Amino acid sequence: MSLFNNHPELDFTMREMLIDWLINIYFDQNVEISNRSLVSGIMMIDRYIYLEKTSISRKMYQGIGVICLNLACKLDDTKILGLDYCEYICAGIYTADILSNLEKRILKVFKFGLHFKNILHYIKLISIKENVDDTVYVFARLMLITILFKTNYLTIKTKSMAKNLMNFSKWFVNNKNVEIKNPIHIYFFTELRRYITHPHFTSINRLAKEFRIFSLIKSRIPNIIYLEKPNVFSKEIIPIELQNSLTIEYTENQLNNMNVIEKLGIGSFGLVNKVKFDNTEIALKTHHPDDSKEIIVESLREINNMIMLDHPNIIKMHGYYYSQGITHIGLELCDMPLYKKLDKGNLSPELKKSFIIQLLCGLKYLHNNNIIHRDLTSSNVLIKGDTLKICDFGCSRFVYDKKIIGNYSLDVCSVRYRAIEILNGILPYNEKIDIWSCACLIAEILGEKFLFRGRNEIEVLDSINRLLGKTVGSGRVGFSMLEKHYPNETQIIYKMLDFDPSNRPNAKLVLKIFSECFVAQSELLVNNQKTTIDKNQIS
């Protein structure tokens, strides 16, 4: 199947022009696009073209390209292109409304499932595993973008393509042998030679200079010899599949037929209403940003991440609807946020233990699925009966692999729950920031209102340094009330608050430690009760 079977107005020359144009946007000083977002954006275009069954007109192709690049930035970068920039860079070909509708259509076709492992992901993993030379890695990145000019990459598995690119890159950079015999390597070389000197498509030449490997390439190319080989790639594209999801996309009619029962909350994100839909009461969360016709980052990430989740301690997303910047998310209805449950007091020791274990079970599930929540607070944990559910994934971040460091924002986590590395402005960080926030939450469940007090970062840092010491254990005041009533639990909390994230236990280990702690307490309680009964019987 050809990529353009359903789109007779599109062709491969147009695609080359589009890719070259998108790569040149990478050099615009007014925007910041990561290498990963550039690659993801290009691959997202092809995935969309493959999945879209409605014929795409020639005029819309450029708009699709820039919108896919913008969506890739929203998922992976700290800054986005934005609809205004997309309109500007397209020289007024499209209005904001047209671009907004294109974005809506692309999201609809993908069913909001935009996460996929691209070739760069595997190149990075191979580079880390094999500890390859920086020049080899940079050259492999250039080669990846070079081969994206053609659609042959769609006919071979992503991981296999990454391995072939890395092997060719190691050969090109390090091998003094001037003859290429491997057919795939011959293909890579001919593509490199074609685009590095192309009179019209200048982006690869610019990238090579940007990556500081142009001189290396220029010196190597004239000396390499090879025999022409037939195309080694299949003509058949490997089928592209969507993420599995039990979540439905609401229609406009369904949304209009939802009866609002009461307002549950309002904030900077928008509002949450209790509504009735299909004879079921749900919570309808609405993001309504001012003067924006595009989906905001928080909404995109929230839906993208939640469609992958299915766990009793994670809030369930029933459905969603998006149009012209406004996003509606249908969520499982719960009784109240955790902080209200705690404010009521009178939680039994067993319920406190249950909440702690459930919190850790939910967090373990998130981290196992490569999601960092980044905003765990007692407002973002809900209670339904005696069940605890983690909610609000607007700040969450999907991590393709824990070994790969992404572009992360420091503007995450409510300040009182914010890990010390973020307060100190240290990048990069990882899922261990959730362990710190979780420690603060566990302390709340046990009865400590806030572990660290303060209205801003400076005051919270001062509180942390006063209670925990400026270095681990030095001059620590500690949590005296917690230690008095919950000595064993407090020692675990201290471990979760280690200043060095690498020393903090992961969610799986914290769950294990708390479970063992609670089992030991139960056994001790049973033994004490038995001893008391025996003494009474003797007397």
UniProtKB/Swiss-Prot annotation:
Its EC number is 2.7.11.1. The keyword Protease does not apply. Residues 258-519 form the Protein kinase domain. Residues 1-115 form the Cyclin N-terminal domain. SUPFAM superfamilies: Cyclin-like, Protein kinase-like (PK-like). The active site is at D375 (proton acceptor). ATP binds at L264, G265, I266, G267, S268, F269, G270, L271, V272, K285. The keyword Magnesium does not apply. It is an enzyme of class 2 (transferase). Signal peptide: none annotated. It catalyses: L-seryl-[protein] + ATP = O-phospho-L-seryl-[protein] + ADP + H(+); L-threonyl-[protein] + ATP = O-phospho-L-threonyl-[protein] + ADP + H(+). InterPro entries: Cyclin-like_sf, Cyclin_N, Kinase-like_dom_sf, MAP_kinase, Prot_kinase_dom, Protein_kinase_ATP_BS, Tyr_kinase_AS. GO terms for molecular function: ATP binding; protein serine kinase activity; protein serine/threonine kinase activity. Disulfide bonds: none annotated. Keywords: ATP-binding, Kinase, Nucleotide-binding, Serine/threonine-protein kinase, Transferase. Belongs to the protein kinase superfamily. Ser/Thr protein kinase family. This is Putative serine/threonine-protein kinase L670. It comes from Acanthamoeba polyphaga mimivirus (APMV).
